[in-house]
Amino acid sequence: MVLITEELVRKKSEHNERLISTLEEISLHQEDIEVIEHIQNWCRDLKILLLQSNLIARLENLHKLKRLEYLNVAINNIERVENLEGCESLSKLDLTLNFIRELTSVESLCGNYNLRELVLIGNPCVDYPHYRDYVVATLPQLNSLDCVEITPSERLRALRELSKNRSIIVQKQVEQDIERDEQRIRVAKQQSALAEHCAGIEDEEERIKAFWQAKSEHCPEIRTEIARQHRLGRERHETKSPLDPLKPQRNLFAPCGRPYNLNQAKLPFKFRDEADHYLLQLEVYRHLDTSLIDVDVQTTYTRVTVKKKIFQIAYSEEVKPDESTVQRSQITGHLVVNLKKLKVNELLIAKKSPTKSPAAPFDAGKKDGKPEEAFHGGVVDISNICAPEDLPDLI
């Protein structure tokens, strides 16, 4: 059973700097809450309260919320409308997909004179004959019911038939109450038989499979049991056994210390080797938040982490990490990393003489009467003079 604690409320009030006394809106959906408590004492100024997708069985402890305008308790286990008379400012009430059979309980909302919208879709009472006419006539302050606007002619017609419709609905409620009592007994027997069947299964996976394959009815007890099984499944998934095999860690470096080339994210990329820099263009997903991208530029490799997936590329020459730049396109989302090389190839440029001799070309290469190859000047790449050191192939 999940309780509404101060820690939970503060966690959900980050938009208000975790101050709960001045809180005007809070969302406590999908928390498996079974009882509404403490909120009316801690958050007196609440205007919007969202409690959908929980296991709440009863509307209670809300009468002090005088400023509450919107209450959403859809997809819970509520069986009747009650204890909302003190919510004077309530203008919208959402009770979608609950188990409300007692339709006459909506008469408790007659004092909520600010109520304009009521949603009862997905409840058993919606199938009652003259359901809409009865609610429209009982709550004259409503403007819409089940997201459908109420017209003046519809309201007049419903008021004329109110007494007759109410007697029909009361009779239908009695039948539903009898059916509900029988359902409680029937579901209790089914749950007991299922528990005995699952207890005889030793394999945990087979036991879980047997539960989910069993036929069940649509009722509060089954919804609570399903939520409990979901919670147990999450706990089993989060709690790892010490006997479970650990996932092998991916090696990023060779035994000799050389970085590997990796592309776990399977991202297309381009890598250009220019004279004085490297240029890496990584095609990151266009709509990916930049906060999910981490770039680490080192002297011999660059590592880009995209949603915990690693892209790593090594280069043959060292770079200057402090002078490198990282940019991302606002149009395509691509990542561009400009890596300045530490040692740029030295180029020997022969200087041309300031004056040219009018002598013949074959005389320019002679010295002391010996022929010499003419040197016309140009660029010499010294990287080809010495052979590079033997390095193992990159992976």
From Swiss-Prot:
Entry's Gene Ontology cellular component terms: cytoplasm; dendrite; motile cilium
Alphabetical list of InterPro entries matching this protein: CS_DNAAF11_C, Leu-rich_rpt, LRR_dom_sf
This protein's UniProt keywords: Cell projection, Cilium, Coiled coil, Cytoplasm, Flagellum, Leucine-rich repeat, Repeat
Keyword tRNA processing on entry: no
Organs and tissues of expression: Expressed in chordotonal sense organs, Johnston's organ and sperm (at protein level). Expressed in ciliated cells. Expressed in the head and testis.
Main location: cytoplasm
Entries under Pfam families matching the protein: CS_DNAAF11_C, LRR_9
Start-end of each LRR repeat: 20-44, 46-65, 66-89, 90-110
Keyword DNA-binding recorded: no
Phenotype upon gene inactivation: Larvae mutants are insensitive to touch and have defects in larval locomotion. Adult mutants show defects in motility and coordination and are deaf; lack antenna oscillations and mechanical amplification of stimulus-induced antennal vibrations. Mutant males can mate but are sterile because of amotile sperm; tail axonemes lacked the inner dynein arms.
Coiled coil: 170-196
Listed PANTHER family: CILIA- AND FLAGELLA-ASSOCIATED PROTEIN 410-RELATED, LEUCINE RICH REPEAT PROTEIN
Physiological role: Cilium-specific protein required for cilia structures in Johnston's sensory organ. Plays a role in motility of cilia and flagella.
Similarity comment: Belongs to the tilB family.
Name of the protein this chain belongs to: Protein tilB
Species the sequence originates in: Drosophila melanogaster
